[in-house]
A protein has these predicted regions:
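Peripheral, non-transmembrane regulatory/ligand-interaction domains of membrane transport proteins
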Residues: 1-208, 214-217, 221-228, 286-289, ...
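Hydrophobic alpha-helical transmembrane segments and their immediately adjacent juxtamembrane loops
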Residues: 46, 223-320
Length: 320
């Protein structure tokens, strides 16, 4: 592998430093780890291997598990993946495991949610302040949801402009994909909200007075993200219904045009079939059959009648 999937950090003299082995008050970050890395961390920390593997299943639900020697928190985080030249937004699990001596994060990919912590750009972040670390991760996660929701909103605006000029299947499918993403986001945010509510009442997670404002900010940001996702879902649903009505109306217009063309073309067909396309002298008394210019006159009459019928149909209420 090009980069380490197991990285260890510790706050030393107010700075986040990468270390080579677990220490008291350190942070172990596992991103798409190997079986060997998982086994090593399990032996070093005493965390059950099954719990370390749990967030590597993208169907794992958000929850809080309290074990004898550690507590595991699983939340859904947003992620973006590029496929076919465009970004696709999804949610994946992230676990935060708190032991007596360390805090462990496990995710199936190297998530940008944790990058600022590694870079030491999060204000007031210390690896040994576990409760604050959890809240800071949850706050960062909620802000990432808000950021992606704003991007999705801008993408839906661009799609709306495209759909006004071109009703292509590609744009409509992208609109449906965005709607599906918002449903996933809303479900994940609501699951995370339940986790946050449980954390506030969990005796093992110590509550410090200086972290109360941060906890309030986390809950507020998450609620705002839920509301925003619900609003955008409603807007996209209305937009999808509107464009479905436009497509249906366009189809009706096409059918109307085809019906008018079909009726118009049936008139000369009827006239010519009556004459049998034969202008022989004395043809059962049919008018103009004995005239050399009769064929041209019949064509002219057919065109005039067709034009009159077309004019009538285009103005008829029946075809509007």
């Amino acid at each position: 592998r090009v980069r380490d999937m197991l990285r260890m950090f510790r706050t030393i003299n107010g700075q986040v430093e990468q270390i080579q082995k677990p220490e008291n008050g350190s942070w172990l970050c596992l991103s798409d780890p190997t079986d060997v890395e998982l086994a090593n961390v399990s032996m070093e920390t005493g965390v059950d291997l099954a719990d370390l593997r749990a967030p590597l299943d993208d169907e794992e639900r958000s929850r809080v598990d309290v074990e004898d020697d550690y507590t595991m928190i699983i939340v859904d985080i947003p992620t973006v993946e590029e496929r076919g030249g465009r970004d696709w937004y999804e949610t994946i699990p992230l676990s935060i495991i708190i032991t007596q001596s360390a805090i462990i994060t496990v995710c199936m990919q190297d998530t940008p949610v944790l990058h600022p912590f590694m870079e030491g750009t999060i204000r007031g972040f210390n690896t040994y302040m576990k409760t604050r670390f959890i809240l800071q991760i949850l706050y960062r996660n909620a802000t990432m949801y808000l950021r992606y929701l704003r991007i999705i909103d801008r993408e839906s605006d661009k799609l709306e402009l495209k759909l006004r000029h071109s009703m292509q299947n590609r744009e409509i499918l992208m609109l449906l994909e965005l709607s599906k993403t918002l449903v996933y986001f809303t479900t994940s945010l609501k699951s995370n909200e339940i986790v946050m509510e449980k954390l506030t009442t969990l005796p093992r997670i110590k509550q410090y007075p200086e972290d109360e404002d941060l906890l309030d900010d986390v809950i507020t940001e998450n609620k705002q993200a839920i509301e925003m996702a619900n609003i955008y879902s409603g807007v996209l649903a209305n937009m999808t219904d509107a464009f479905a009505s436009i497509v249906s109306n366009n189809l009706n217009n096409v059918m109307r045009i085809f019906t008018i063309i079909s009726i118009t073309l049936s008139i000369p067909t009827l006239i010519f079939s009556m004459y049998g396309m034969n202008f022989q002298e004395g043809m059962l008394g049919m008018p103009l059959t004995d005239k050399p210019w009769g064929f041209a006159v019949i064509i002219g009459i057919s065109l005039v009648v067709s034009a009159i019928v077309t004019w009538f149909l285009t103005r008829s209420r029946m075809f509007k």
